[in-house]
């Protein structure tokens, strides 16, 4: 999860360089941010149940492959359009990685302590979101051709993580359905609310998460 999230946030300090290199307007930068969020939102809504169907490990592997491919495409981007495509891919991969890794941490937690699994998930995400801009900023300042070389650490770490995950073999969870073709209703999102007694803390927590990511996006856009 940490490596995948790092790849999603790595480009934030590079946007001023892209703006100077391609002569971008502020609206172009906004569009690039929206492209990533569109991919992430679509992934969370329509691909969030893949882990229930196939298990978290295959979904996590494919998510890491996709985010590494998106980061590599970012390094090779030759126009705004190609960079937007890379950000959409990274957004889709971000949703796959965060959902599957969160489920995996919960399932592999031997103590069955949900709070501990949640803390580990939050720590991994925060570390990845912090390392991404840090590595991107340092590479942009000190390494030649930063619009290409800044992505190298993420590509290398992504490759290592993919290799490591393919060495891990876990039994198929009993809750996973038998392999087969997805019907249309399997792809459609199911948005539900918890029982009435838990709705207020649920909505407060959701508002807190929304505000946190909104503030992060605001400051990242001003970097």
Regions inferred by a protein language model and the residue ranges of each:
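Flexible cytoplasmic inter-helical loops of multi-pass small-molecule transporters
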Residues: 169-192
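Helix-loop-helix hairpin linking two adjacent transmembrane segments in secondary transporters
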Residues: 112, 116-169
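Extracytoplasmic gate region of multi-pass secondary transporters
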Residues: 201-223
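Cytoplasmic helix-loop-helix junction between adjacent transmembrane helices
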Residues: 86-127
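Extracytoplasmic
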Residues: 1-26, 217-223
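Helix-breaking motifs and short loop linkers at transmembrane-helix boundaries and internal kinks
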Residues: 23, 55, 76-82, 144
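Paired small-residue
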Residues: 70-73, 81-90
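Central cavity-lining transmembrane alpha-helices of secondary-active solute carriers
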Residues: 31-49, 98-103
């Amino acid at each position: 999860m940490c490596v995948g999230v790092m790849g999603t946030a790595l480009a934030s300090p590079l946007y001023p360089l892209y703006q100077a290199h391609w002569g971008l307007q502020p609206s172009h930068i906004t569009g690039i941010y929206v492209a990533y969020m569109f991919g992430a939102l679509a992934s969370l809504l329509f691909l969030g149940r893949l882990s229930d169907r196939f298990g978290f490990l295959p979904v996590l592997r494919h998510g890491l492959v996709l985010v590494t491919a998106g980061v590599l495409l970012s390094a090779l981007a030759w126009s705004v359009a190609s960079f937007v495509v890379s950000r959409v891919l990274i957004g889709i991969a971000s949703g796959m990685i965060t959902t599957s890794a969160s489920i995996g941490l919960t399932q592999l937690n031997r103590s069955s302590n949900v709070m501990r699994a949640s803390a580990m998930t939050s720590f991994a995400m925060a570390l990845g979101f912090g390392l991404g801009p840090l590595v991107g900023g340092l590479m942009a300042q000190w390494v030649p051709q930063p619009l290409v070389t800044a992505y190298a650490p993420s590509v290398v770490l992504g490759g290592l993580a993919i290799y490591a995950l393919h060495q891990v073999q876990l039994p198929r969870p009993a809750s996973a359905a038998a392999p087969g073709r997805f019907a249309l209703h399997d792809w459609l999102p199911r948005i539900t609310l918890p029982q009435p007694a838990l709705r207020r803390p649920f909505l407060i927590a959701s508002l807190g998460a929304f505000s946190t990511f909104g503030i992060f996006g605001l400051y990242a856009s001003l970097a």
